[in-house]
Amino acid sequence: PYFSENELVSQLKVSASYGKVGNLTENAVPYTTYRYSGNYNNNIAAYPNGVDNKDLRWEVINPLNIGLDLGFWHDRLTIGVAYFHKKTKDMVFDIPLSTAQAGYTNKDGVIRASKYINIGEMTNSGIEVTIGGKIIKNSDDGFNWSANANLSTLDNKVTKLYEGKDIVGSYTLLREGEAAYTFYLPEWAGVDPATGAPQWYDKEGKVTSDYNKAEKKVLGSALATLYGGFDTRLSYHGISLDAQLSYGFGNKIYDQYGEFGYLDGKTAVYPGYRSQTDYWTPENPNARNPKPVYNRKDKAGAASSRFLYKGDYVRLRTLKLSYEIKPAFLENTYLKKVQLYVMGDNIWTHTFDKNFKYDPDMQVNGYASFALPPLKTYSLGVNVNF
């Protein structure tokens, strides 16, 4: 309802919704056992693509949303608060199997053993807050300043799995009570300052240079727990300045190609990262990287938290300065509006983990995958309305 006579509260709205949604996977691959893109003597050929599961069902999502929107002083200040809870049942996941259970050879001659099944349940819940304000409000030609901010939290939990068992991958696991995309890795303990050997923590929390004794641990999720944005606009006599920022906190990112970026002397094939030059020597005992050893066998580059980084970031997505020519100058022309502008996109990003080299605002699975940041672009232009 809108309170036209109320000078303080101009808007008060309460909303709630609940539903049931079927969620098909992003493509039909989980539902197929053969593909027909193979070639045999220049003819179309079918080849195995998966293990049959006649009981595979759609995921079912039950979303609950409750919101409150408020406006004050004729909407000079607006506040929105919403709670969401989304429960997903019958999650579709590709689980590994032994080749004795269900192995098949794909078109590349690689033996695969996995099967898509409905493995369990997951919840996503959190709070979304939006605040908007017309901080300084004058006539269109006067000085005006407005700003908007939004903040969201996310609590993701896997609540039920097939037979209650962990599903462990090369770098991650699914476990009841943990978030999806949880990293499960040996914990890196740095470099032995006496010998330059790589170190990890064993199951008793002691330092070891034997990778086979290193204990895997839950080391965070690829999902951000806090994210949002901020935008603002200042204008005066046709001149406007617009800025937009975004941010994300609480997630981890894994560089699965770190073994090639930090070769530690293993081979000369790849140039690697520049920071690998900070390696152990008797004169540099507190180096970040182990002593270089050609054709090394100690698994210094094996999967571990050595290549796991914090994904926290703040990015200035857009900065735009514009000038709109006054209508009086456009009289007796066919032009209704002319705006001149200079604009920059993705011109600044602050990554809080100084050792991370790639774009922190990336795909949800949390793998760096040599991902380059969005290009910085600068443009000068004219918008014309007839």
Locations of regions flagged by a protein language model:
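Extracellular/periplasmic, surface-exposed regions of secreted and cell-surface proteins
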Residues: 1-176, 237, 303, 308-386
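Surface-exposed, extracytoplasmic segments of Gram-negative outer-membrane nutrient-acquisition systems
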Residues: 41-48, 84-119, 148, 155-223, ...
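Solvent-exposed strand-to-loop "edge" motifs in beta-rich extracellular domains
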Residues: 235, 246-248, 324
